[in-house]
UniProtKB/Swiss-Prot annotation:
Name recorded for this polypeptide: Maturase K
Keyword Plastid tagged: yes
Pfam family name, one: Intron_maturas2
GO cellular component terms listed in the entry, alphabetical order: chloroplast
Amino acid sequence: MQKEKYKKYFEIDGSFKKSFLYPLIFREYIYIVTYARGLNEYGSIFSENLGYDNKLSLLIIKRLITRMNQPDHFKILSTDSEQPTLFRYNNILYFQMISVGLATIIEIPFSLKSLCSFERLHIVKSQNLRSIHSIFPFLEDKLAHLNYVSTGLIPYPIHLEKLVQAVRFWIKDSACLHLLRLFFHEYSNWNSQFISNKLISFIFFCKKEFKTFMVLYNIYIYENESILFFLRNQVFYLRSTFSSFLLERNFFYEKMEQFTEVFDNCFGIVLWLFKDTFMHYARYQGKFFLASKGTPLRIKKWKYYLVNLWQCRFFVWSQPENIYLNSLSKHSVHFLGYLSSLGLNPSVFRSQMVENSFLIDNRKCKLDTKIPIFSLISALEKAKFCNAVGHPISKPTWAHSPDSDIIDRFVCICKNLSHYYSGSSTKSLYRIKYILRLSCVKTLARKHKSTVRIFLKRLGSGLLEEFFTEEKRILSLIPRTSSISQRLYKGRVWYLDIVCINELAHHKNLFMKHGNRNSP
């Protein structure tokens, strides 16, 4: 009976057999998409040669679809409570595998549209745009001319049917949509706590297992932003008749090399560059901010535009009081782990048009990017590196490891911090490095059952010199003969090769996981 119950979802009328997704799910293996010309030109994630460490490949999806088509495996959709516990866990594993397959299928139409946008706008694919730091040079250039910024959380639908409705525009195959609804319904029976008012938190912290929900949520966000940008173009139509945008490669999926981490970037950073400089929009980690130049009334209007759009078009509840409006000159904006604000003392740039002509003084406010010291200390406290007031303590859980491993772990943390917060003053990180350095010494002293003073006297102070030499190693690659290189030693440095250290922006798992970073 179970087989007959669910078999109707796999029976498609002949008129639907020409649909795009039908041969992928029911007739052919999914690896046929690797031969699609449009996907291969830009290096699609589907055609990457993934290794064993990635734990997922097209071969796994191929086997999954083959097993789905076998009659004996229709019983995986059954949720009989009398089944053995081991079999129920096996069913959950099947649902997770189906989720990965559905995410791959649903992503294809969206990826094709993104590739067409690249071709139409003649955007050259740049590896630097994949870096988390790539947005900060843009902010330095644009926010210095703006006055106000509005920040808040993007509301999310409380019912998963809204996510299914959002994907209808991209997928015309009704059988796939029915299968998607069936998947949601059956999985909610396995985990009654899944569908709750914490949907967005669930999506953030269950990145690897439930990629289908990540795909659907990204499509839902894309629909929101499409209407927002349409309204924006109508408002600024007389100022700019054409609006171009720069869409990062990690907008919809994270990195091509990491298929298992397709949505590990948690919706990624979306950077839209408008010709009109009076409004800029950015989205990150389920949050947004609007920056504008002019009076507070203008940014307030956009705030209520967003609220009405969410409530009237997408039927999601948004609280206007949770959307904050601040002045850039008086308040700092917490953005991707930095506290960004405009400096109180504007810089003066003196320019001269031609020789022997008069000089022109131009004033420009400088964007200050500071490190949230108290947030980092709080994260260190949760990771058991220090107490509430910032006094270093030993790490007992690491005391059983070899001395070299303990030192390497602490040095790795300092390197991550130095790389990510290279855009701020190096003096600001000294306190954090000091805490980690003493925590390392206390951990080693605890292991050898000695005091910190005796341990350092016996081994010498040069034991931990690696903690403060990372920046010198990087900057030593730049010759110091020119005046430009001299300024690099004093100014901020943005690394455009940080592709996967997203935990740094939220201070979660920062001190346990080393980011995937290419060599500088």
